[in-house]
Swiss-Prot record:
Annotated protein name in UniProt: Antihemorrhagic factor cHLP-B
InterPro entries, per the entry: Cystatin_dom, Cystatin_Fetuin_A, Cystatin_sf, Kininogen_Fetuin_HRG
SMART domains in alphabetical order: CY
Species assigned in the record: Gloydius brevicauda (Korean slamosa snake)
Function: Potent inhibitor of hemorrhagic activity but also proteolytic activities. Inhibition occurs by formation of a non-covalent complex between this protein and the proteinases at their metalloproteinase domains.
Site feature location: Cleavage: R139, R140
Subcellular location field: Secreted
GO molecular function annotations of the record: cysteine-type endopeptidase inhibitor activity
Glycosylation positions in this chain: N95, N203, N281, N292
Domain Cystatin fetuin-A-type residue range list: 20-129, 140-253
Signal sequence annotation: 1-19
Length: 342
């Protein structure tokens, strides 16, 4: 019994010590908070292997922990939103359009660790979990708006292949293959399937590209041509076969990947596999929002090892003692909504 009491007291002492060192009262709308959030999103976009570039929407919480022998660890809890720029798009994220709610927006919850040492801040890790807005909410606000489909849906895959074949037929001496399917939606009135996908130029002829026994490869480093396509393929309600002569609208933009481009390594990551982005409702760094419930788990951490208090204890606790003054404390978090709330 005495041992049990001693263990309880020891736990209370440790908890009290951690609570004392944990600084939770950081203004989520302050200049430092905004600077840290921008740094975190830049890090996430640089390490994103799939899907779309992100912007931060809300700073949910900030925790500051001591780090031995010096410095501190800053833990940000962020909500991000998907833009319309694919990760391979060289457009600066500041110039990318945030995907609006009526296009079935996707939100990410991210925990980001930042090391602050001798006046220098450095992101040392990030973990993100993404979810699309619910179908019910989309339909409640816009009954006829397009709804996200699993990227493995046959209509999505067939539409991508159909549009890419049509695109290759128009080109002379250039053949492209799919790098990644990143979005698929079902449209209504008229019935159609909307798709977005990344492509890369390969060293095959058109005939070789249709040969299942021939393996195409991207052009040599420094000569890669990558692009991104948005397309709508119109289908009848009863049509379940692969599209043949359906009407379609497409817009494919081709980028030149310069040697040393930050994302040139992604081509080798993708090519050789028929890729869809990883699924949502999983812990993923890349926030790729494939909406296909596939299993994916990616975390990013620098190789630097830091001594820190475990993240699991970095949660704000409800005080056990009620303060005697009757003034209402200023609510510092969450911060303001920068775009819209899902």
């Amino acid at each position: 019994m005495n041992s049990l009491v001693a263990l309880v007291l020891l736990g209370q002492m440790i908890g009290s010590t951690l609570s004392h060192h944990l600084q939770s009262h950081v203004d989520c709308n302050g200049e430092d908070a905004e600077k840290w959030a921008d740094m975190a999103v830049h890090y996430i976009n640089e390490h994103n292997l799939h899907g779309y570039k992100q912007v931060f929407n809300v700073i949910n919480e900030i925790h500051v922990l001591p780090r031995r022998p010096r410095g501190k660890i800053i833990i940000l809890e962020l909500k991000l939103l998907e833009t319309e720029c694919h990760v391979l798009d060289p457009t600066p994220v500041e110039n990318c359009t945030v995907r609006p709610p009526h296009y079935h927006a996707v939100e990410g919850d991210c925990d980001v660790k930042i090391l602050h040492d001798e006046g220098v801040d450095k992101v040392i890790g990030a973990k993100c979990h993404s979810d699309p807005d619910s179908v019910e909410d989309v339909r409640r606000n816009c009954p006829k708006c397009p709804i996200l489909l699993p990227l493995s849906d046959p209509h999505v895959v067939d539409s991508v292949e159909y549009v890419l074949n049509k695109h290759n037929e128009k080109l002379s001496g250039h053949v492209y293959e799919v790098l990644e399917i990143s979005r698929g939606q079902h449209k209504y009135e008229p019935e159609a399937f909307y798709v977005e996908f990344a492509i890369v130029e390969v060293n095959c002829t058109a005939q070789e590209a249709h040969d299942d026994h021939h393996h195409c490869h991207p052009n040599t480093a420094g000569e890669n041509h990558i692009g991104f396509c948005r397309a709508t393929v119109f289908r009848s309600h009863a049509s379940l076969e692969k599209p043949k002569d359906e009407q379609f609208e497409s817009d494919c933009v081709i980028f030149d990947v310069k040697e040393g481009h930050a994302h040139s390594h992604l081509i080798e990551h993708h090519i050789g596999n028929y890729n869809t982005s990883p699924g949502h409702n999983n812990t993923v760094l890349n926030l790729a929002h494939s909406h296909n419930h596939t299993s994916a788990s990616h975390e990013s951490h620098s190789h630097e090892h830091v001594a820190e208090v475990p993240v699991a204890v970095a949660k704000r606790e409800v005080p056990t003692n009620t303060p005697h003054d009757h003034t209402h404390p200023v609510k510092l978090c969450p911060g303001k909504v920068h775009h819209f709330k899902l």
